[in-house]
C-alpha cells in the first residue's frame, strides 16, 4: 500500500480513506482491468479476420495486457511474497472470481458461435474455462521467465487449441467464431 500511495502521489491515509483496505483497492483495480481486458478480448474475437488469426489475436491481446502492466497483473494474481503486512489478504480468494468471470464470458462466446453438437453448452463451458486456465498459466510462466518471444508463445498456444477449434463449425445464424 505504501508503494501504491507513493506511485499515486498521495499519502497512505488518503489511499485507505478512499478504498478502505487492500481488499477495496483490489476490487476496484480488478473490476477496472478485467473490464478493459474483456473489452479488448471481445474486439480481437470480433475482428474481420480468419478464425485462426482471431484465435492468435485473442491470445496475443491477453499476453500484451499482462506484459504492458506486469505490476498490476502480479498484484491481481499473486500475493506479495514474504510481505508480513499482507498476511491477512488472500489473493487467491479474490483472483479466482476474475478467472471464473473470464471463463464464463469465453464460454458464452463459444456457445453462441460454435456448433459443438450434443451437450454444447457444457462443452463450451469446459472449453472456456480450460482456455482461460491455459492462458493464465502459460502467461504467468512466460511473464516470469521470458523463455520465448510473445509471438512464439502465441503460435504455440494457438497450435494447441487449433485442432478442435478448426474442426468445429460455426453455429447456423450465429456471428461465427
What are these regions (language model features)?
Residues 74-77, 85, 119, 151, ...:
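Short, hydrophobic secondary-structure boundary micro-motifs
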Residues 1-24, 28:
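Helix-turn-helix
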Residues 144-148, 168-177:
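Long amphipathic alpha-helical segments
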Residues 86-115, 122-133, 137, 152-163:
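Amphipathic alpha-helical packing segments from all-alpha helical-bundle domains
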Residues 41-48, 76-84, 138-146:
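Secondary-structure edge/capping motif, primarily at the C-terminal ends of alpha-helices
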Residues 4, 29-33, 37, 41, ...:
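Generic hydrophobic, amphipathic alpha-helix propensity
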Residues 19, 26-33, 76, 95-98:
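Alpha-helical DNA-contacting segments of helix-turn-helix folds
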Residues 28, 43-71, 154:
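Hydrophobic alpha-helical connector segments
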